[in-house]
C-alpha cells in the first residue's frame, strides 16, 4: 500500500515529521517497508528555460536548444516531440546520473553538434512509463531551483506492508484513523455536500444471490465531460505509481486508494435493459428491436461463457464466477474487473457509477483461477466495509460533479442493506492482564477502544465491546486485546526474566522417538516433506465431513481456508504435481498435525508410495509398489515403538476412512485406541487429483501411540548354525475368514529351535476347493543348532505341524 504525506493530510491534521509518522505506523502494526523521498533522490535536477531552438543541420528530428541555466546559456541537442522555445524544463547537467539506465551525462557530440546536458522526460527519471516528451514545468518555476517542488514531488511516499486481515487500512482514510487513535494527529470529519438528484434511473437492478452480493448500489449520471482530471488528482496518483487516464478513471482510483472501496463506471449508452448480479454466466442476445433486448440463457455442457475484459484479454467464465450483466451479456466480473463492452472513453457522456460489496471468497476464487490481479480484487477479497459503501458512492459522485461539468444525477438505486451490528464481546481488565501482562484501568481500555471506533458499554468490571463495521477481523477476546496493546504500545510492556526451563523427559523421549521414525523411513528410501497445515475446504470434504469451526476466518487464500483433518491430501497433491512433471516413482513421509476440532490436534506420521520400487535396468524389470511395501515400512516403525503390527491389525473391521479402498485397507488399534490405518487409496480420490497410478499409504497416530519405556541391556549374541538348512513346502486348506498373517505368525513360533523362516508364496481359492475355503502355500526353512536334521526329524516336524494347524485353524494338508 502506497500513499503520500499530502494524501494523508487530506484526512488527518498532523504536524509530525516523516520519521515520526513512519515509526508510529510500525508501532501500530502497519510495517513501513520504505519511505521514498523523490525530492532528495532528484535534488540535482534543476529548472531550466529554453530561450530559442533551431533545426539540427544534420538530423531532421533533432533540435539545437539554447537553454538558460543558473550557470549561463548552454547548447543542448534534443529530439523530444514537444521541445519548443519559451518553456520551463528539467535539466540534467554534465556529471549527473540518470535514474533510468544509471548512466552519467557527459559533454557529447551528436551528429556533429555539441551538447552540454540533457532535457529529461518522466520515463528517464523513473516517474512514469510516459516517454512522449520532456517534462514541462509551470511558468513560475525559478531557473536553477530543484524542479521537484514545482512538479509535486516534494511529497514523501510511504510504502507499508498490509497483513491479509487488515483490509480496513487499504485506504488512506483507514490509516489516518489508526494514527489518530495512536495520538498522532486528529482525524478530520468527512464533510459531504448534499447531492441533489434530478431524475430517477429507469435501469432496473436484480441481485440473484444475496450471499454473493450483500449490497449493490449505483447512480446514473448524465451529460458529463470525461476530460483530463485536475493536476492535484493526477499528481497524487502519479506519485503512488498509478497511471492517469481520464477524470472518471482517476476518480475511481482515488476513491479506492482513499477509502478502500472499489468503484466501477459503466458507459450508460452501452448498457441495455436491466442490470443483474449472479452466478448464471451464460446469456446471448436473440433479438433486437427499438433498444429492447430479449435474451436466452444458454446451458452448455460445461456452463461456460466468454468474457472480454477491459484489459484486452478474453476469459472463460464458469457458473461459479459472480458476474454483472445487462440483457446483452456480461459487463463485469464482480469485484475484479470491468468488461470492455461498457468501458468509458473520452466521448462518454452518460455513466452508471457503481459501488458494491461482494463475497470475498468468491472474488478470491475467481481471481486466482483466472489469474487476474487488480486493485479491486485486492480490496474485495479482504472484505469491504459495507456500511461505508453508499458514502463512497456519494464522495465519487461529488467529485464527478465538481470535475466533469454540470451533470444530472439520479437517485441511488440500491439492493441490499448495511451490515447488522455485531454481537458484543464481554472484555475484562483481568483478561487483558492475564494474556499480555499489561495493567490498565477500565477507563483507559475504554478510551483506546473508542478511539479505534469500537462501541463500548461498561458494566462493573466488564466492558461490552462491539467492533466497528470496518473491522471484519475482530471476532474473539484476543483480537480486542491485540488492538489495545498495539495502540498502548508494545514498547511499554516491561521485560521480565524468563523462568528457568526444566527439561521434560517425556517430551525429549518423544522428540527422539519421532527422529528415529524418520530415520527408519529414510533408510528405506522415503523422503521427508513438510506441507502447510491448512488446505482447501473443497479438497478436505473428500477426506472428512466439514466442520464450521475448522474454517479459517482470515485465510491467506481460498486454497488454504480449512484446517486439515488428515495429512494425506497434501501428500497426494504432491504425487499429482510430480506426475504432471513426469516423475512417476515416489516414496515420502511427513510428521505433522491433523485437526479433529478446535480442541483436538493429533500428531500423525503419514507415509505414501506410488510407482515402482526400483527403476527398470538390464538386470531387473522393476517392480511396482504394493500394499506389502507400505505395510513393511509401517511394521518397522511399529516394532521400534515396542509393539507388534500383527497384534494391532484389526481384520474384521469394515468401517474405514472414506479415502481408502474399501477392501484393500485396514485399521490398526491398540486395545480400543485407534492408532491409524494403512492400505490403498480409493480410486475416486485418485480421479479427483488426476492420478492414473495406484497409491498406498499409512497413517500412524503418534499422539495415541504409547511411549513405552526404553529397555537397555546386553544384547543376545547372534548365533549362526554350522549345520545344513532344510526347506519344506506345505499347502494348507483353511477357511476363507482365517488371516494368513496369523497362520504364518503361529508357524514362526511353532518350534523356535527348528523354524528359521516362513515365506508365503501362493494363495488360491477357486472351483477346485470347497466353498468357503482357500489354500495357502508356504516355504519353511528348518535348521538345528546342534546337528544336521535327519529325515526322521523332518517327518516328525511335519506330522506335528499338520496336527497343530488342524487343531488351531481347522486346516488340512492339501494333497
From Swiss-Prot:
GO cellular component: phenylalanine-tRNA ligase complex
UniProt xrefs under HAMAP family: Phe_tRNA_synth_beta1
FDX-ACB domain boundaries: 721-814
Leader sequence residues: none
EC number: 6.1.1.20
Subunit structure as annotated in this protein's UniProt entry: Tetramer of two alpha and two beta subunits.
One of the Pfam families matching this protein, by short name: tRNA_synthFbeta
Residue span(s) of domain B5: 420-495
Biological processes annotated in GO: phenylalanyl-tRNA aminoacylation
Family: Belongs to the phenylalanyl-tRNA synthetase beta subunit family. Type 1 subfamily.
InterPro entries recorded: aa-tRNA-synth_II/BPL/LPL, B3/B4_tRNA-bd, DNA-bd_dom_put_sf, Fdx_antiC-bd, Fdx_antiC-bd_sf, NA-bd_OB-fold, Phe-tRNA-ligase_IIc_bsu, Phe-tRNA-ligase_IIc_bsu_bact
GO molecular function terms noted in the UniProt entry: ATP binding; magnesium ion binding; phenylalanine-tRNA ligase activity; tRNA binding
Compartment(s) where it occurs, according to its Swiss-Prot or TrEMBL record: Cytoplasm
Cofactor annotation comment: Binds 2 magnesium ions per tetramer.
Record-annotated tRNA-binding domain positions: 39-148
Protein name: Phenylalanine--tRNA ligase beta subunit
Cofactors (names): Mg(2+)
Sorted UniProt keywords: Aminoacyl-tRNA synthetase, ATP-binding, Cytoplasm, Ligase, Magnesium, Metal-binding, Nucleotide-binding, Protein biosynthesis, RNA-binding, tRNA-binding
Main location, first listed in the record: cytoplasm
Catalytic reaction equation(s): tRNA(Phe) + L-phenylalanine + ATP = L-phenylalanyl-tRNA(Phe) + AMP + diphosphate + H(+)
Binding site for Mg(2+): 473, 479, 482-483
